Structures are given as structure tokens and as C-alpha cells.
């Protein structure tokens, strides 16, 4: 089979993952109800598809003698080193096999998505357009259902499909206040929906800035609907971390368009705005919205254990464990994998302590280096493709969310961002390679 067909097969499989991963919450619920012992494999469908997609790509690379491009890419070496480290840790530490399997999937799937997308788009730059289309389909489903949840559907609509406290709650509330219902859309919860909305907003806004003049009226309306729907999902997720991440992402996106001579003025304006905003929020702290949503202080009833206290307790415990175990505690030792049979539950609400808890300071350092490398490639490509600015800004926002939530532990968020980041990096590598394996002139 020639490389063209191999690449097409891989592109189709990768597109299915990118479009379908937004349904992961729904799929996970159905797997828990109907798949029994095979539920973990069903939940890992997208990782398995990415592994399958990597096989024809490896053959195509060999046929085109393009392995040198990957040897020269430091991120590829970093990902291989991280995978090797995980293998060593699994061999040394002994956790329940189910927990270790889930931990490996959660820890490595984002980097696998980056590798597959980088390879695919490097070999066939036009695949970037099809991947963006797949992402757009998934985004449309997510924000469309989110708007329906806010406007017309009953709050427990998802309960008829098996959503419950035993699987995924059909909805949540802010501090047990039924006046502030937090929606999920098809994702695993309100916080992942908020984080995903930050990514969608960055992509939609950056695309609009780049292509607004070329868009027809219907296309402008569709783009506006995506932006509005993403804002609805972000606001009604009531995710404070996502709101903060959206602010950081917006600042980074704006800064990427500002000429250097105005950067200082932008920084000063942001400082003033932040100070004024802080004063306004504090002065309105007794109003129902600010009291409930920002401070989670429900005077009427409220939960006994506040989420802020939970965050603080989680951070203190995680910092203590990481300090005592600089080599980590083992893959599958925290998060949802630690909730399985025979495991000891550890919930860590910080992405970086999450990494260090499982793989130690070395694993944390390797993953931060990989992330920094991915962001650096986006920075270098920001003037060549609008998507680079969008993903750079979204990455900054998601990393901010990671300070209070394990943002990369969510399937939809981690696969979408890393896959698109890898695709853009592959496009940029193809555009600047000499000779390039194919023309890479489209800016989509």
C-alpha cells in the first residue's frame, strides 16, 4: 500500500478521535452501565484508535525516509523518555493493574496525540484542514447541547441516559444552591466544560480575526454562534478556574497581536484593570451572585465542606506526599485510577503536583519540558498560522487552570489541545523543511 493511502487512513482515524472525544463523558457512562469488566477498554477507545492510527504513519515515514525529521525534534525524544520512565515506574512500584493501566492512559494520551498529529500533518500538511473540520464538528455538538441545557432542557435531562452520582452527575450546583445549576454538556463535568470552552473561544476568536473579511454572511453568523455558545458554556459551567483561565488566555491572545512598542501600555492597562476589578468584586461580595459563585458562600444552606477547603486540603496533602517521596508514588496512585478496586484513593487538585505524585520530580520536569517545547513551537509559528496564536493563548489559560485542577486528566481537553498543537507543529515543520514532503502553503 502506498504512503498516500496510509496517510488517508491515519487522517480518518485521527479525525474520528478529534470529533468524537467530546462525547467521552456520555461514552464513559454507557460503558460503566453496560460494558462491565470491559468498561476501561471502552473508555480508552480514543487512545486505542490513536495507537492504530500511528501504525500506518510509521510505515509511511519509512517509505518516505522521513525519520530524520523526528530524530531532530526534541519533543519526540522527550515523549519517548517519558514513556520509558513510566515503564520503569510501573515495574518498580506495585499498584493494582487496573489503576496502572488507567494511569498510563491518562498520563501519556496527550503526548501520543501530539506525536500522531505532528507526524500526520508533517507528511500531509493539507490534513490540518480536515482535523480542524473534525474539531469544529465536535465543538458544535458540545456548545449546541450546552445551550440547550441552559435554555430548554430540564436540569436532570441526562439522568435518563444513566447519569447519576454513581457514574457522572447529570448536573451540579454551586454550593448546593439550586439557583446556580452547573451544566456538563457531554463532558465529564462542569470544570472540564469550562476548560474546553476556553480552548474553543481562543480558536474561534483567532480564526475570526484572521478570516473575517473573507467570510460570507452565513459563515460569520455560524462563527458568532460558536463564540456565543462557548461563552454560554463557560459562564454556566460556573467554573472559577475556567473563568480565570479565560482571562489569562484572552490577555495572551491580545498580546500576540499587539506591536512590541505597545506591550508596556498593555501591561499597565491590565494591572489597572485587575486592581479595579478586585475592588469591585470585593465591594460586591455580599450580593447573591458574587457571594455564591465567586466565594461559594451560600448563606441559606450550602455544603458543610466547602470546595475552597477541599482545594486547600488537597494541596497540603499532595505537597506533603511529594516532599516525602521525590521519586513519586507510582503510576495510577492518584486521581480516578486510585479509586479502583484495591487502590488507595488520592485526589490531587493541582496538575503539577498530580504529575509529581505519580512520576516524581523527574517526571514532572520532563513533562514541563515537553509542554514548554510545544508552546515554543507555537510561539515560533504565530506569524505563519492563526491557529498557533489560538493554541498558545489556550495553552496559557489551561496551564493556569492546572494550578487548581488536574486539567490534563480530562480526555476531551487534553486530546483536543495536544492533538491540534501537534498538528500545527507538523504543519510548521513541513512549511520550513528543505525539501518539504508536500506543499504547505494553506493557512486554513
Predicted regions and their residues:
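Transmembrane alpha-helices of multi-pass inner-membrane enzymes
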Residues: 247-250, 391-403, 407-444
